[in-house]
Amino acid sequence: MLKHSSAATKENDSPKLKVLDIVSKLEPSLDHSHTHWWKLTSPQLALMLEAADYSIEKQFETLLFHYHWVVPYLGPKPDADGNFKWRSLVSDVGIPLEYSWKWDTATSGPDVRLTIEPINELSGTRVDPLNQAPSLELLHRLAEILPRLDVSWASHFLSTFYDHDKLKYIKESESETGMPLRSTMLVCFEFGRNGITTKTYMSPRKLGQQGFAPLSDYHSAIAALGPSCALDAVTEFLNNSPEGPHLSPFMLAVDNIIPCSSRLKLYFATPRTSYNSIREVLTLGGRLSTVTLESKLRAIHELVKAIMPFPPDLPDDADIPFPEQVLSPTVQDLAESSDMANQRPAFVAGYQYYFDIAPGASLPDIKFYIPIRKAQMNDQAVATGLTNWMRAQGRGAFCNAYTRVLEGLAGGRDLSKCHGLHTHICVMLKGNGEFDVTSYLAPGCK
């Protein structure tokens, strides 16, 4: 059963939740589902904002935004047996929300973000088989209060990634060989110190498709935006690197701002988990190089060792063994299973990367996602490994606050008995040699 910190909503429970107490008192309940999701998520978000040292004003702004713009789009609450009308793939507990904690840098404190799959009563029905209407409605309405919001790129990919005959999607999903209806569109909210911004995530889904879409579907849609040297560099890498055949695309994301300022992030999964594989991808086969690059890559690998079930003396060219209950996936497993939900255990056991290939860039920025194998690593072990690594980088100022966040998400359970609060830890090596580090966190653990 999912555990969460319902106790955090009690009146005068803690001074740090005073902002939440005020918002909860003054804002009326909208309906039973809204009340359910608010009671589950608002104490968690309030705790994260306080732990990240947001100002009181920003805490009010963010919680009010969450109340009016996020919670109403989390969909119908689960029934008495815990079943969801539309089961989102955002988290493996079915809740259509994931938090992220972007760690502090030399010049800024942590940033709190969350990603949702907007859902309503018609999600997965003949009216909206791919569950995209709630996301579109949300973005359209947000344009009225977020003046920088621009959905030009999201609209472009929406028009190219999907077929328009909704009834055929329903009929296909009901056939013996058709792929079940699954999540295809997510919205991320970044609660920055200077304002709220959004991103849209999409996974292509064409009629007749089995599993994740091929790279060609992404390539043609991206190429239609104009020439991209970064895309050309990634394509050349995939065609010529020994790691290329192992990388399978699964998602694309854009910032909802004017295209000339937006990132265009193409996500890949791979079953390969060796150090040599990390090095090959993060250097784009040697195309990216600096004097200190090797030492930085070794530091990233030390983080891998700290939060993964890493065997002693594993050679640089060897993959981390997969858990017994998850057979080592092949690229074909990742790309061709008829149901993306069935791919999840193998999918999250390997590494993930994104390449920022926005037009105008000569080479892509690359971010590396380390999966948390929750069957093998409890959340206390992950937290200890991560915070020790952050302290070793001279960035330990918020480690204790981060642990408090985890304890809140665990709802009072011992972190050593929790598996699944951490979903991924991601790292990007910036041009100045500093690491961007982000923790992705579930809204509870089983």
UniProtKB/Swiss-Prot annotation:
InterPro entries membership: Aro_prenylTrfase, Aro_prenylTrfase_DMATS, DMATS-type_fun
Name of the encoding gene: xptA
Pathway membership, UniProt: Secondary metabolite biosynthesis
EC number: 2.5.1.-
Domain of life: Eukaryota
One Pfam assignment: Trp_DMAT
Family matches, as CDD domains: PT-DMATS_CymD (cd13929)
Protein family according to the UniProt entry: Belongs to the tryptophan dimethylallyltransferase family.
Claim: Transferase is one of the keywords in the record: yes
Name of protein: Xanthone prenyltransferase A
Binding residues annotated for dimethylallyl diphosphate, in chain numbering: R113, K199, Y201, R263, K265, Y267, Y369, Y440
One example GO MF annotation: prenyltransferase activity
Transmembrane segment boundaries: none
